[in-house]
């Protein structure tokens, strides 16, 4: 039977000093026999997805205490990718994932916490916490702050839904009035919560639900709705229960690595493909799988992408639906339920409820459940009131979206396409693979050829787009923006969004060894591996080259001869120390970012640290 880890600091005469310090935090004699549960919060006044989490932390701590645990809260950092976007701040976003994972390991291991509950929400915070939980492998529960309500504006006497991406698109249109832009800007992000589309934050919160480390509703129940409070309370109760199950009953099934096994990762990826989630999720799942010691690679994702239909299309891939609409249609469990009816899922994976997936779907799929509380939860909708307060409104839809032919979630029979919403492409330009969100592309553009225009920074590319230097048929190549070359693998939301501003998003493509925001759509291919800084072929592309993209065949090809390619390699290598480095770019790189670049692997490995380098230190 495992002993509480915390007994290292709470038991025995030689720990009297530690107990004295614990007492100074408010603990009493009775607390020294209870499990110490780390409440890993990510509250921040910088981030709308995290602005409400201070109150959430207090609620969860109180419930843990009531349930028989000792709650000890600490904070991680949190970067808002939307605010950091389009300038040097984005260099820090992806590296913060590793910093978050490390900081959790430091605090939890230094204080010998027995378990942890992770209060996350936005882009790099959820994956950083996920990596930490799988690394530490102690009882863990995830609960996100919840998605933001969609923004709304009046246009042509109609109310239309908008989000952050709409604000960026219109900001890049020179003919749009300042007053209209201000109206959109003031309306796009009306409440606390993670941005309202199926961007990276909401995608990751949906995936933790599918993996089994978060409760049903985690990914889609609005931050502002009163039902979210119930989810926080239940999550706090469950972390105490599974902690006691592990330490008092030796139930190892509740440990993160036993929940997040290979089949669970595949279920999560199948969900991701079915809903056309953010391409960043692939990066984060690959990283998390390495922490879990699970053999899950790009090749596994490629196989899944060919058999999973695309059954849910949400902003930015459509303006019709946001995450609040996914919730009304049954949420993550609704999407998984449709995949399950086509026998596509691993049904024996288990979760923090200690149910297998089949049992969970029986209870939480709106087409299967007999539980009125479940139906009631999925009726939770937007209040339409600007607020930064958590669980502050109680609006409910009178009926759910059961339309599986034309609704927000479709059946596999009525899928948008039988080929999923994400795809992996290979070719001489990406020998180790690259990623495209097919959910955001018109079928007529699945096969695309164009002329390369090469840039060595996203700033340079964005400027060219706005200055009218890009024309239909161009393929913008942005290189040296990978994990090592950036460093930090910036998101290219501004260039792709400016293509929309210039009405070029359907007639141009953009490829990069960087990555994309979850808000990106169009012919946008990222994560090209190897990256330019790792001697990838993208470093050898020249202006005027023809690039061929074929999504049905899963290929991307630089249309030059092998002889020419060999010549370019020799040409680049002749530059000596200056080879495979950007030459036209001026960028300050801090020592922290240099350290990240030194240890980072390419995107096909999740942009995690190269442990071979670490082992040689």
From Swiss-Prot:
Positions binding Mg(2+) in this chain are: 81, 123-124, 491
Q: Which key words tag this protein in UniProt?
A: 2Fe-2S, Amino-acid biosynthesis, Branched-chain amino acid biosynthesis, Iron, Iron-sulfur, Lyase, Magnesium, Metal-binding
Gene3D superfamilies, A to Z: IlvD/EDD C-terminal domain-like
Instruction: Please tell me whether the keyword rRNA-binding is annotated for this protein.
Output: no
Q: Which reaction does it catalyse?
A: (2R)-2,3-dihydroxy-3-methylbutanoate = 3-methyl-2-oxobutanoate + H2O; (2R,3R)-2,3-dihydroxy-3-methylpentanoate = (S)-3-methyl-2-oxopentanoate + H2O
**MF terms (GO), sorted A to Z:** 2 iron, 2 sulfur cluster binding; dihydroxy-acid dehydratase activity; magnesium ion binding
Cystine bridges: none
Name the NCBIfam families on file: ilvD, PRK12448.1
Protein name per the record:
Dihydroxy-acid dehydratase
Look up and give the organism this protein is from: Buchnera aphidicola subsp. Acyrthosiphon pisum (strain APS) (Acyrthosiphon pisum symbiotic bacterium)
């Amino acid at each position: 039977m495992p002993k509480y880890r915390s007994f290292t600091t709470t038991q025995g005469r030689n720990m009297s000093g530690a107990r004295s310090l614990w007492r100074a935090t408010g603990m009493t004699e009775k607390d020294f026999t209870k499990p110490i549960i780390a409440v890993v919060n990510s509250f921040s006044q910088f981030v709308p997805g995290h602005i409400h989490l201070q109150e959430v932390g207090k609620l969860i701590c109180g419930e843990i205490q009531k349930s028989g645990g000792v709650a000890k809260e600490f904070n991680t950092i949190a970067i808002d990718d939307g605010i950091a976007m389009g300038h040097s701040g984005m260099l820090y976003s992806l590296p913060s994932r590793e910093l978050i994972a490390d900081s959790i390991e430091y605090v939890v291991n230094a204080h010998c916490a027995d378990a942890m509950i992770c209060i996350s929400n936005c882009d790099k915070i959820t994956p950083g916490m996920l990596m930490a939980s799988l690394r530490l492998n102690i009882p863990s529960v995830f609960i996100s702050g919840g998605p933001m309500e969609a923004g709304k504006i009046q246009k042509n006497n109609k109310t239309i839904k908008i989000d952050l991406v709409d604000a960026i698109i219109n900001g890049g249109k020179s003919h749009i009035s300042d007053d209209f832009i201000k109206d959109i800007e003031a309306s796009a992000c009306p409440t606390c919560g993670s941005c309202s589309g199926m961007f990276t934050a909401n995608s990751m919160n949906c995936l933790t639900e599918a993996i089994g480390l978060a409760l049903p509703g985690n990914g889609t129940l609005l931050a502002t709705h009163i039902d979210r409070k119930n989810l926080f309370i239940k999550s706090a109760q469950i972390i105490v229960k599974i902690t006691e199950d592990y330490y008092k009953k030796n139930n190892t099934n509740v440990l993160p690595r036993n929940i997040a096994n290979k089949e669970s990762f595949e279920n999560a990826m199948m969900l991701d493909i079915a809903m056309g989630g953010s391409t960043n999720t692939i990066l984060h799942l690959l990283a998390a799988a390495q922490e879990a010691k699970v053999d899950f690679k790009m090749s596994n994702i490629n196989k899944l992408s060919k058999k999973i239909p695309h059954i849910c299309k949400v902003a930015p891939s459509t303006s019709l639906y946001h995450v609040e609409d996914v919730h009304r249609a049954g949420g993550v469990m609704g999407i998984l339920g449709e995949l399950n009816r086509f026998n596509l899922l691993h049904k024996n994976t288990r979760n923090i409820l200690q149910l297998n997936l089949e049992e969970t779907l029986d209870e939480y799929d709106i087409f299967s459940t007999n539980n009125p509380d479940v139906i009631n939860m999925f009726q939770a909708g937007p209040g339409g009131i600007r607020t930064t307060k958590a669980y502050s409104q109680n609006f409910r839809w009178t009926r759910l979206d059961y339309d599986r032919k034309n609704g927000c979630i479709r059946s596999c029979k009525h899928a948008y396409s039988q080929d999923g919403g994400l795809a992996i492409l290979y070719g001489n330009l990406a020998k180790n693979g690259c990623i495209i969100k097919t959910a955001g592309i018109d079928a007529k553009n699945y096969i695309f050829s164009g002329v390369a225009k090469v840039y060595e920074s996203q700033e340079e590319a964005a400027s060219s787009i706005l200055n009218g230097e890009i024309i239909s048929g161009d393929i913008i190549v942005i290189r040296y923006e990978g994990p090592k070359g950036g460093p930090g693998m910036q998101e290219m939301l501004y260039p792709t969004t400016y293509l929309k501003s210039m009405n070029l998003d359907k007639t141009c493509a953009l490829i990069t060894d960087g990555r994309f925001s979850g808000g990106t759509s169009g012919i946008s291919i990222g994560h090209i591996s190897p990256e330019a800084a790792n001697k990838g072929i993208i470093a050898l592309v020249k202006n005027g080259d023809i690039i061929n993209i074929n999504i049905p065949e899963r290929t991307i090809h630089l249309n030059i001869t092998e002889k020419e390619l060999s010549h370019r390699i020799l040409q680049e290598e002749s530059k000596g120390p200056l080879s495979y480095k950007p030459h036209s770019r001026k960028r300050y790189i801090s020592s922290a970012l240099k350290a990240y670049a030194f240890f980072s692997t390419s995107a096909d490995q999740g942009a995690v640290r190269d442990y071979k380098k670490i082992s040689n230190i």
